[in-house]
Amino acid sequence: MSIIQFSHANGFPAKTYSVLFEQLKEHTISAINILGKNTNSNDINYHDLTDEILESASQFGEPVIGIGHSLGGVLTLLAAAKKPEIFQYIILLDPPLFSPYKRFLIKVLRAMKIEDLFSPSGKSKKRRDHFDSKSHAKSIFLANKLFKNFHPQALNDYVIHGLTAGKNDVKLTIPVAKEVAIFHKMLTSFSKNVYKVKGTLVYAASNPILWTSDLHWINRKFTGLQVIPFPSSHLFPLEYPESTAQNINRCLKNFNLRFK
């Protein structure tokens, strides 16, 4: 049994991943439900979010397995690079870990103030964040292609935990403004320590956010990362949590065989 420190994707509270966690119940799961919950949109940044993960992971007094999806994957990588003694291994689920070429493009787009035309932030800005009720929100989600392949329970969990009731309506628990701000704060440079981390990167093979050039760069620079595909799109931990858990357990088994 391992202790897992899990970090969620941008916009999806950790409790949305309950099906995945259930499949990993032989392990102890620690997860901050909403990273940056008490930070406003203007002040949120990757470094503070990384420190939140480190604070949570360090409470166990022994090295943990760091697992993160998307944003959570990048933050897990940064955390393991900053305090390697806290992590015995990391598993990154389709992190937006881009090559220098793509990061340069992002910097140019930011300088031109047109990042939203190409970044997920543009779509996030258009998201509806208030609904009449949770049932009303669910009906809208079901018609949204973002959720079309979601595991039914994952969608239910998102309706329960991704929405907060107000006086007369419900709203997204993670506000659109904060989700957009996190996309806008995506790092365009990394410290040299990130290249020393050991672990596995599982990338989405369908409609990939990681281009072939990104994967070539990752394979060349991150010599301690095993890179493997998953036959689905970016949200696969919420779409196919059982298969994702099987992949995670295989990664952990291989880690135990290789390093223990």
Describe each region flagged by the PLM:
Residues 153, 162-220:
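Conserved serine/cysteine hydrolase catalytic core
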Residues 63-105:
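Conserved hydrolase catalytic core segment
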Residues 31-67, 103, 108-109, 246:
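Active-site loop/oxyanion-hole signature of alpha/beta-hydrolase fold enzymes
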Residues 5-9, 69, 203:
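The conserved beta1-alpha1 loop
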